Amino acid sequence: MGSSTKKKKEKKKDFQKTKLKVGKTKAKPDNFTDTSFRAKTITLNQQSLHITAPSSDAQFTHHVSLLSSKSDTQRRDSLAHLTTSFVSRPVDSPLPQPVSVLLPTLLPLILDASSSVRTQLLKLLRALPANDIQDHVPQLLPYIRAGMTHLAADIRVSAVEVLSWLVYVAGAEVVSCAGGWIKTLNCFLSVLGWHTEESSKWSGNRASFGKSGAKGQPMVKVLAALAVFLQAGIGRPDDGMGDSSDEDSAMGVSGWEFPLCHAAQHMVPQATAPFVHLNLFGQPRDEEGEMYETREDRYRVFENRFLRAVQRGLEGARSEGGEVGRASAGVSKVLKEAIAYGPGA
């Protein structure tokens, strides 16, 4: 009996709360680990003990490799480091790596889910030399168009901002490269919801930009980018181009065709293939993927395929008033000047 009573007491001991006596500390558990020590040094097995720090080129290459990291913060910080290295470099000095090497890593970030990464990417792109970007416009546009048709509203707005920068840097290359005119205009109409006449009658098909679009700020950015894009594609040529002709006429150089009318139409054309748009002897072609190098070709395509849709959309945007109405006025101004100038003199 004594042994069984002792076992019962030991089992009950685990479920009984011990009474603490005054002046005595609580007993420490059996699995207690003392953490009161302080380490003077921490030794890492793979710690680098190089005396010399890595060079700036090595750091640049390291941060380029981190652009594909899974961490949003790491990608943003790497973009910030690259931007600082671009801005702080001496004038007329080459980049640590050519733009052709950097773009394949940078371009997928246009579709990044993190807004901070996309904002930092735009800052980096603006720090790149403009002359180096002009040769890589066909490589940039597919990612921009993919962003403009993305499901996320924030990514669509960020892609429009990148397109505005690209038109400012290389507007002629953007509108004249393969697919740069028709495909980009289709993306604009898709973002704005101006594609068909039926879409303007139904509120469900109108442009939606989520919570950020409540005040119309994204719509203003898209309309401003559309105005810049149309100005680069079908805008009235600069007056500076006509100054030389005025000077020539004043000197009596351009008056040789009098009294003939439209003499320039019967001269040898300046374009390489003036009748290529007729496609007289060629196979059926993809109009969306073609290159429209002259303003006349771009205006002809715009008038046939997009003019009515843009005019109809501008009327609806003007009726909204506010900042959206003012932004639509800028697009209307460019459009009126282009229509007044026509396909060209």
Curated annotation (Swiss-Prot):
Its main location: nucleus. Residues 1-30 are annotated as: Disordered. Residues 1-11 have a biased composition (Basic residues). One of its GO terms (biological process) is rRNA processing. InterPro entries: ARM-like, ARM-type_fold, Ipi1_N. Gene3D superfamilies: Leucine-rich Repeat Variant. It comes from the Eukaryota. The keyword NAD does not apply. GO terms for cellular component: nucleus; rixosome complex. It is found in: Nucleus. Signal peptide: none annotated. Keywords: Nucleus, Ribosome biogenesis, rRNA processing. Belongs to the IPI1/TEX10 family. Component of the RIX1 complex required for processing of ITS2 sequences from 35S pre-rRNA. Component of the RIX1 complex, composed of ipi1, rix1/ipi2 and ipi3 in a 1:2:2 stoichiometry. The complex interacts (via rix1) with mdn1 (via its hexameric AAA ATPase ring) and the pre-60S ribosome particles. This is Pre-rRNA-processing protein ipi1. It comes from Neosartorya fischeri (strain ATCC 1020 / DSM 3700 / CBS 544.65 / FGSC A1164 / JCM 1740 / NRRL 181 / WB 181) (Aspergillus fischerianus).
